[in-house]
Structure formats: C-alpha cells, structure tokens
Regions:
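Glycine-rich phosphate-binding active-site loops on the catalytic face of alpha/beta enzymes
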Residues: 130-132, 180-197, 335-350
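Hydrophobic or amphipathic alpha-helical targeting/insertion segments
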Residues: 160-230, 234
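Active-site mouth loops of central-metabolism enzymes
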Residues: 83-85, 99-118, 137-139, 161-170, ...
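Alpha-helix-loop-beta-strand connector modules within alpha/beta enzyme cores
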Residues: 141-165, 213-230, 263, 295-304
Length: 421
C-alpha cells in the first residue's frame, strides 16, 4: 500500500501517489491505495495544518462552527467600515477602470454576433441607456470578421463605447479580434484547456508543469498583441468551467478559481503586461463572494493591485435575479471591492443597467461616507455543541376558583348567558 502526505496547495505535489485534490488550502492530504477484489479505490484523508505560512492566503470559518468562510489574511481595507481598495488604473478604450475612478457599468449583447445590423442596434440602445462598456460574444472566425463591421458601423454613427470580446476555446479568434476591440475576456478554464471532463484524474509533477508550459505557449501571443495594440484584458474565472488539472488538484472550490486565474496572471506579469482585471464568477453568491475575497487576500500577499470586475453568473430574471446579484455584488461593494460590475439577467441587456447603476451608487455612497457599524462584542453561536439555556419562568400564583364560583355563581352564569346571547 502506497501512502503520501503533501501540502494540497502546492503547485506541484510531490508524492508517490498523485491522486490528490479536493482539500482546503494548506491542509495536508494523505492518500492510501485500498486493495479491492474487483476495483481499486483511494482513501483520502485531510490533515489540517495548525501553523500555515502567512505567505499563503486561506479560508477559515467566520466563527467557530460557522459555515461561512472568510480569508484568514486581510481581504479588504477594513472589516468595520467601507473603504475602497486601492487599485491601479486599467484603460478600456477611452474608459478608465480603477479605484481612482467611478465604478463602471457594463452589460452584454444577446444578438447573434454575425447579424451585424441587429448587434449594432442593440449596442446603441445599451449605450443610450447609460452603460460604460459592452461585451460581445465571439465564438468563431465568422463572428470575429463581423466584429470589424460592428466597430466600423458604431464609429460611423458616433458611438465610441468600448467593446469587449468574450472568448472561449478559441485563441486564434482572440488574436484576430484583438486588432479591433478594446478588451479581451479570456476564461482560464477553457482558453488553452478544455472544460473539466475528468478524463485524467491524476497529474504528476511533470504533467502539471507541461500543461503550464502549454498554456504559456498559447496565451503569450495574445498578451503580446494586447500590449502592441494597447488592449485591456479580463482574466475571468468561471466556477462552472474549471479545467481537469485545476479540478484534480483543488476541486470545485474558490481556491481552484483563484489558482486558475493566477496561472494566467503570472504569464502577463512575466511579459510585463499589467492592463488587466480579474473576475471570479459563480452562480452561487456565497461561492462568488468567497472566491473574490480569497483572490484579494492573495493579491495583498503578492503586492498586486489589479482592479476587479464583479458579477454573479446566470443570476436569472425578475426579483430573483436582482436579489442574487445584490447579495453577491452588494456584499463585495460593502467590503470596498469592485471597480466595474455587471448584473447578469435573462432579460434584454438594457434592463440590466438600472439595477447595475443602483448597486454602483450604493457602493460609491458607502465608500464616500465610509459606512460601518458601531463596535460591539461578538458572541458567536456554537453550531455543534448543545447546551440548555438557563432562565427564569414567569411567576405563577394559585387562585381558588371554587370560592369565586360559590359566592358569585349566579352572577357569573348571568354574564356567560349574556355573552352567549
């Protein structure tokens, strides 16, 4: 039986058995082969590290037994009041994103990108409604070719709103559209990798390093092109589209989302490219908030100051969609995090602008007034320990009703009869 105990957060796990993953940051994973008659399984146990290094951000319960996780390290300027996090400025066309500028509002078109006329018309409606940035999905080369026509048509009609290309699975398409659009959104989970298929569950140290080199080889030309043309970029991790490599090491977790984005960010920094923002989107607001906070905690550790794009994926429609977005985006804005936001609704994109603006105004006002809470003594509930509460019952006094009935029986019956009548 082969066993090994290794830090689960290391980029390359050194163990004789590499079937590791699904552990929290800086916990240790022990893997054992269990010999079965018909099939083999691996027993995985997590050994908590009681003294994790301060150089690695990690999540911990907000209080003893609490299901809410927050970073152990600093993840915002203040946990008592809203103070906006200081970031560098990233230029998206003629629009500046960063802590020195107002929170920018953006949305995404819903038309077929190949339908140039319909897309141009929708972008103009969005711009007239008050959006600062518009994102357009670009699936293939025909859509990329249409992007040139879309950009030219908008310029001819005096619309200079920055356009963002949403790219998945197609590095060559990103290379082409970077020549005309102002910003490229890449998803680290599927730009160079495929979305997790779980075809490969075990990665050796060499396998992991080879995939990182493969990512750098594919991603670097786009970074160089964005530098050449002065384009911005969003490294946008999606909770639902992590790669096999990330899933096998970190699982479907906020830590995996952060590590996926950092792999691409390190390549950008290596090539001296800094005109990018981060996003950590999930359809679950709790996961989304935990991922963003962990990302910021990690950036504080690294000394990075890149802006944040906030959003909840597939929030829905009507009140439900607005409430989900308000919970996720609003929580982070109260933390002082977020420099551009999108409220994702299954409605016409123009309908996203008003709730987006309301949230941006609330976040701006909270930061301006540095809204907070008065100091108070925290008393945490113990979720797993049972203890009977003590207290004093109300005073009880014995009354002799028989005497009342004997003395005033006739009068009592008279009043009862009157009530019944």
């Amino acid at each position: 039986m082969a066993t090994g105990a290794v830090p689960a957060s290391f980029t390359a796990l050194k163990s004789r058995d590499h079937g590791l993953g699904f552990a929290k940051s800086m916990d240790f994973v022990r893997v054992s082969d269990l010999q079965r008659v018909k099939f083999g399984r691996k027993k995985v146990s997590v050994i908590t590290n009681s003294n994790p290094g301060s150089e690695i951000a990690e999540l911990q319960p907000a209080s003893q037994g609490s299901p809410l996780l927050v970073p152990r390290q600093k993840y915002c300027e203040s946990i008592h009041k809203t103070v906006r996090r200081k970031t560098r400025t990233v230029m998206v066309g003629n629009v500046a994103i960063g802590s020195e500028h107002p929170i920018k509002i953006q949305t995404m078109t819903t038309t077929d990108t190949k339908d140039v006329a319909a897309t141009v018309e929708q972008v103009m409606r969005i711009a007239d409604t008050g959006a600062d940035i518009v994102r357009i999905t670009v699936q293939g080369k025909r859509e990329a070719d249409a992007c040139y026509e879309i950009k030219n048509s908008l310029v001819q009609q005096n619309y200079n709103i920055p356009l963002v290309a949403d790219i998945h699975f197609a590095p060559s398409v990103a290379m082409r559209v970077a020549e005309c659009f102002d910003k490229i959104r890449v998803n680290p989970g599927n730009f160079a990798d495929r979305r997790a298929q779980f075809e490969t569950l075990e990665y050796t140290e060499d396998d992991y390093q080879k995939e990182l080199e493969h990512i750098e080889q594919i991603f670097s030309p786009l970074v160089e092109k964005c530098k050449k043309y002065g384009r911005a970029m969003r490294i946008g991790t999606n909770h639902g589209s992590l790669s096999d490599r990330i899933m096998s090491y970190y699982g479907d977790s906020p830590r995996g989302m952060v590590e996926s984005a950092f792999e691409f960010a390190r390549i950008c920094r290596k090539l001296d490219y800094h005109n990018f923002v981060f996003s950590m989107k999930a359809s679950n607001p709790v996961v989304m908030v935990q991922a963003y906070r962990l990302l910021v905690a990690e950036m504080y550790v690294q000394g990075w100051d890149y802006p944040l794009h906030l959003g909840v994926t597939e929030a829905g429609e009507g009140e439900d969609g607005r409430m989900k977005s308000a919970i996720g985006i609003g929580t982070l804005l109260q933390d002082g995090l977020g420099d551009t936001i999108r409220v994702s609704l299954t409605e016409p994109p123009e309908e996203e602008i008003d709730p987006c603006r309301r949230l941006a105004n609330l976040g701006t006002r909270a930061a301006k007034l540095q809204q907070g809470v008065a100091p108070f003594e925290e008393k945490h509930r113990h979720y797993f320990d049972f203890q009977r509460r003590t207290g004093q019952l109300p005073m009880q006094k014995e009354v002799l009703f028989q005497l009342f009935w004997d003395l005033y029986g006739e009068l009592f019956c008279y009043f009862i009869q009157r009530l019944l009548n």
